[in-house]
């Protein structure tokens, strides 16, 4: 939040809420009646962990989205940007490269990927049910980076879940080597 404020001159409101808790989530809608749209980036995202703890991933990633979608029309929130994943494309075959948004979805290779596929379908069904809500779904291919000021962006603490933090930690001498297999 400090970084955003330094860059923009505006300190964003921050509410720490478990989106699985519908009553707590609704309290945020009530506190901020002028919400115009939602950018939903909140999700568990470690592929390996999702294999070990699949129910946690389904509960967190799917229930949180359902709660948001159920509350949006009641509070006049007209749009949602959803952070999905390239995992909805599965393991692409060489003949299907490069992958475009028109590429066919394949069976997810992890519970994490499956939650993203399920959530995309939930959003599609919700929008096509006549809900007065519009959606954008973003399918990332391992997003990385930070603002040029370095005030906001990726700052992994502990074991990273993406490649670039491993590379930078190795370059800085925090890690002795980077093993590629």
Predicted regions located by residue number:
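Short, conserved active-site loop motifs that form the nucleotide-linked donor/cofactor pocket
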Residues: 11-12, 135, 178
């Amino acid at each position: 939040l400090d970084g955003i404020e330094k860059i923009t001159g505006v300190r964003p409101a921050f509410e720490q809420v478990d989106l699985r808790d519908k009553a707590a989530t609704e309290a945020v809608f009530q506190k901020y009646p002028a919400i115009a749209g939602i950018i939903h980036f909140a999700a568990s995202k470690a592929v390996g962990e999702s294999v070990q703890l699949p129910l946690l991933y389904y509960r967190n990633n799917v229930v949180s989205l359902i709660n948001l979608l159920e509350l949006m029309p009641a509070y006049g929130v007209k749009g949602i940007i959803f952070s999905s994943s390239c995992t909805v494309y599965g393991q692409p075959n060489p003949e299907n490269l490069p992958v475009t948004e028109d590429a066919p979805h394949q069976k997810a290779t992890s519970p994490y990927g499956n939650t993203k596929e399920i959530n995309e379908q939930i959003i599609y069904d919700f929008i096509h049910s006549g809900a007065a809500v519009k959606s954008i779904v973003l399918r990332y291919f391992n997003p990385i980076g930070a603002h040029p000021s370095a005030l906001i962006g990726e700052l992994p603490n502990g074991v990273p879940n993406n490649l670039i933090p491993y590379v930078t930690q190795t370059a800085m001498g925090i890690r002795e080597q980077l093993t590629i297999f």
